[in-house]
Amino acid sequence: MSVDMTKWCEIAKANMGKRPAGEGRLGGKICIVTGAAQGFGKGIAEELYKEGATIVIADMNEPLAKQVAEEMGKRAVSIAVNVSDEESVANMVAQTVEKFGGLDLMLSNAGVVRSGPLAHVEKKDFDFVTSVNYTGFFLCAKYAAIIMEAEHEADPEAMFDIVTLNSKSGLEGSNKNFAYAGSKFGGIGLTQSFALELCAYNIKVNAVCPGNFLDGPLWSDPVRGLFVQYLDCLLYTSP
């Protein structure tokens, strides 16, 4: 069941045209970046901040997210979120509107990976990847769009963005990494479908499909990173 966002829509509408412009190319823009406590998300959030945006560092790792926000500066705050949980995502968006008065950019970056041969990947791992990478993007886009559509009603000239950090694995298959690739292929379908629907509200929806970021947690995490998971795969293929 959807979370009622009526209160937050009214607040966002009332604040259109009243928010301070700020300095820089993104001065006055309010941005949520999920999975922003480390890796790609952190780097993106830092660059947006440098351009003048107000940033929400949204992440499950609340202590690290708080640290990143504090290091970034006064225009950054941290909010704990589980992108696979609808109420958590709705609360993240509501808190953003409560703190800053609206939302201009949702950057859905949070992602996980579980790799392995088809016969050995368990359903719980497949479901976990799907819930974060695919369903998580749906939920972030849904609740961002609810606010942005209300803001569009107040100011039909305003422009908004929803961006997902997809992957090269959303463009071609990935050997023994099908759960991740499948979720990213699905994300491309969501992106194109959302874009067709939301353009009527001046909401642009796009996906960025980067290659491997070997220093990021998806690869380098010592317990669940892809380096470790691919080494584990050798156990299944060695004679």
What positions do the PLM features span?
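Substrate-binding pocket helix/loop in short-chain dehydrogenase/reductase
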Residues: 117-118, 122-127
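Residue(s) in the substrate-gating loop at a strand-loop-helix junction
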Residues: 167
